[in-house]
Every structure is written in C-alpha cells, then in structure tokens.
C-alpha cells in the first residue's frame, strides 16, 4: 500500500519539532531579557531615589549652616569698625549687650574712645556676641539690632551702642522687647525704616554663628584687644596710650 501523501514523514516531524523547540527557546530568552531589563531599571530608579534623598538632606542641612542674612559692612570674623581704618592704633571689643561687665566697660571708656577716635588715633572694631544665650534670647536680639543699625545707619551706631548699655536690663531677666529696642534706636537718631530689621531679628542666626566661630582668645565678655593683644579691661586706657606713644608718626 502506498503511503498517505497528507501524512508528514518522519523527517518532517523532526524538523517541525526542532522549529517549535527553537521558537520556545527564543520566547524564553526574550522573557529573560525583559526580566533582566526590568531589574536594571528598578535598580536605576532606586539609585536615583537615594541620590535625591541625599541631595535633599544636604540642602536641608545647609539651611542650618548658612545664616539667612549676612551683613555686608561687617568683616568675616564679625566685626564692625568705627573710625579711620588706617588709624595708628586698632582696638577690638567683643561684647554682649546682656553682660553687666560690658556695660561697666562701656561707661568707663566711651568718652575716652570717642576722643581718640575723633582725633584719628584709634579705630574701634565692635563684635556683638550672644555668649549669654543660655540666659535667654536678649543677647542675640540686641546684637542683631546693633547689626541692623550698623548696616543701615552706621553714623548712629556709637549712640545706639551706648543706649543699649545705658538701658541694659537685669542679666537673665528676659530683656527689653524688640519694640523697646527699636524705640532706643529711634532716640539715637536711627531712621524709622530700620525698625523692621530690628523687630524681625534679621541677623540673629548670623550673630550666633559669629559667636560660635569667634577668636579662641575670647572666653568671656568683655574681651578687649589693643593692636591684636588682649589687655585687661582695667588697663585698657593705659594700653591705648602706650600704643599711641609707640606708634610711628606720619
């Protein structure tokens, strides 16, 4: 009997089997490639997410390290100079407006400094600090107010500096309100437009950072330097006069 031509031969069946096997193998390989691609994509997305979190954390941390406002008229170390910067004698005063010894130093030496400054003999650099922050926020608020005045009404800074010490509240008693400090500024001739800087505490963060990064020789207030040498407060005037006597004449 002759074979049925519609029935595939053994060779044809083997070829069909190989074709189906190859197709199944290629399908499995495509599925495996898709699976691996998915894993790579997921890993990449996870890495991006981690980087994003790190960047956000760094930026958030940076907000704590960079003060919101930085005064342009102060040095990098936090000092504001009154008088001729080229004067033969340089005086630096590190002070806290809540410090009673600073108020005593100011009362004893304000006239002396004014005379020497106006004569062109002395340049005075003031460093408003908040070393007594543990007693409340008045140190930083008053120091910030002093920075506001130095920035926006520098000619009135000496008078406002005197007024803050002359009206110094009892140490640790809470201090003057921002409105009372602004009123002292107005009495010292500071323009009204400076009030918002004072009452907003614009430079409090900056004051705290300057205090924390202060000269290592400043262990308390007042700390007074004459030509970069620390001198006892009760020997200050003698130290200035000695420096003037030894200064070269022009």
How would you label these PLM feature ranges?
Residues 81-83, 114, 215:
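Short secondary-structure boundary/capping segments
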Residues 87, 95-97, 103-178, 186:
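Structural alpha/beta surface segment adjacent to cysteine/selenocysteine redox centers
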Residues 91, 99, 224:
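Conserved S/T- and glycine-rich ATP-binding loop of Class I adenylate-forming
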Residues 71-89:
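A short beta-strand-turn-helix
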Residues 2-39, 43-51, 58, 183-250:
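C-terminal cap of thioredoxin/glutaredoxin-like
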Residues 52-73:
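C-terminal region of N-terminal signal peptides and the immediate post-cleavage residues
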Residues 93-96, 218:
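Processing junctions and N-termini across compartments
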Residues 45, 55, 84-87, 91, ...:
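Hydrophobic/basic alpha-helical segments enriched in Actinobacteria
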């Amino acid at each position: 009997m002759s074979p049925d031509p519609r029935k595939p031969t053994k060779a044809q069946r083997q070829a069909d089997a190989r074709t189906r096997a190859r197709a199944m193998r290629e399908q499995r390989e495509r599925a495996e490639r898709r699976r691996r691609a998915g894993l790579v994509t997921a890993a990449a997305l996870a890495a991006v997410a981690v980087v994003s979190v790190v960047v956000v954390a760094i930026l958030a941390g940076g907000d704590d390290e960079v003060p919101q406002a930085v005064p342009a008229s102060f040095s990098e170390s936090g000092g504001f100079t009154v008088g001729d910067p080229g004067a033969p004698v340089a005086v630096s005063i590190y002070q806290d407006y809540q410090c009673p010894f600073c108020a005593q130093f100011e009362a004893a030496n304000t006239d002396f400094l004014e005379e020497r400054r106006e004569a062109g003999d002395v340049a005075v650099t003031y460093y408003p600090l908040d070393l007594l922050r543990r007693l409340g926020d008045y140190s930083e608020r008053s120091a910030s107010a002093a920075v506001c005045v130095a920035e926006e009404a520098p000619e009135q800074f000496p008078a406002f500096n005197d007024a803050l010490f002359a009206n110094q509240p009892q140490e640790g008693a809470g201090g003057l309100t921002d409105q009372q400090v602004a009123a002292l500024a107005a009495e010292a001739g500071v323009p009204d437009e400076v009030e918002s800087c004072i009452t907003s505490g614009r430079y409090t963060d900056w004051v705290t950072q300057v205090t924390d990064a202060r000269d290592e020789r400043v262990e308390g207030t007042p700390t007074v330097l004459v030509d970069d040498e620390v001198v006892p407060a009760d020997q200050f005037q003698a130290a200035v006069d000695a420096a003037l006597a030894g200064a070269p004449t022009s």
